[in-house]
Amino acid sequence: MTRGRIAPAARSDRYASEQSWIARGTSGPAGGDVMNKVDRDLMNLPDTTVSVREKFGFESDMVVPAYSVADSHVPDTDPDYLFDRQTTMAILAGFAYNRRVMVSGYHGTGKSTHIEQVAARLNWPCVRVNLDSHVSRIDLVGKDAIVVKEGMQVTEFRDGILPWAYQHNVALVFDEYDAGRPDVMFVIQRVLESSGRLTLLDQSRVIRPHPAFRLFATANTVGLGDTTGLYHGTQQINQAQMDRWSIVTALNYLPHDKEAAIVLAKAKHYRNDKGRDIVNKMVRVADMTRSAFINGDLSTVMSPRTVIMWAENAEIFGNVGFAFRLTFLNKCDELERPVVAEFYQRAFGEELPESAANVVLS
């Protein structure tokens, strides 16, 4: 990904002015560039800009720095992806103004893919790290490793993902941020400051962030712990750390029509009158599971991701009801399946084997 190296002293001198250039999304102050094209190439800095109005279709005058050429770390573009305005604008502000952005919300709503698809359209390298309970401080910071040099085994320190990303033009995404271990979270706390330096005590090194380094996170909660019972393993987050996140946006379940449009964008075989009717009924079933969950009648909730999988599985099996049972119903508690089957019956007018009527008859 790196096209070349620039002397540390020169990089240090230019850091502040170049950071400002990236934040403004311009080539430099009036009267000349902060850096010429060769310098920008050496540091892997954005070399173009995109209009939010033209690229994403939202009414906004924001202009975001971007790269003209993608590299191997840029996510693949999904041309059918539908963006949520609030979430997308928050993410774009993170890229344009070096804000630390957290996207919270229920599972399956597209939190991580929103960040990836924004990065894909900016050609901005993006790396995701699943911050589960097994990710340790060593995994993030680095460790000593035995390597072979000149035919001899020697011990050499290898940077973890955090120092590596911190020194490159990478958008680092911490998935499942609220499931991270406390010792790991305190390592991250220092880099939450936009110009904070990362100190590696084992190496007596102080790392300055690359001007194009960006940090994002996704979480099912907002640091207050799991109040729904859906997300076992999540933890409360130190409020001093939460305070360092510049922007926190929520991406929860969308209105019916928007969710149906997302499903149709993915399940193209339903793009006809009959198919649209089926998708609307699928989303209606999902809406009923969410209402039942809110009312305390159901412990499992249907996410937009599940609806998309249901539509895809229905094409595989050629049967909407059978696909529903395999995609969602079998994930539910056995005692709650008659309730979920009733939701299906209300929407589609068909009884499933798990419906209350069939259970009573049997």
Task: List PLM regions with ranges.
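Conserved AAA+ ATPase small/helical "lid" subdomain
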Residues: 253-255, 260-325
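AAA+ P-loop NTPase catalytic core and its hallmark functional loops
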Residues: 3, 21-25, 31-276, 284
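Short, hydrophobic/amphipathic alpha-helical patches that form generic packing surfaces
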Residues: 89-97, 308-313, 325-330
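C-terminal engagement/docking regions of AAA+ P-loop ATPases
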Residues: 317-362
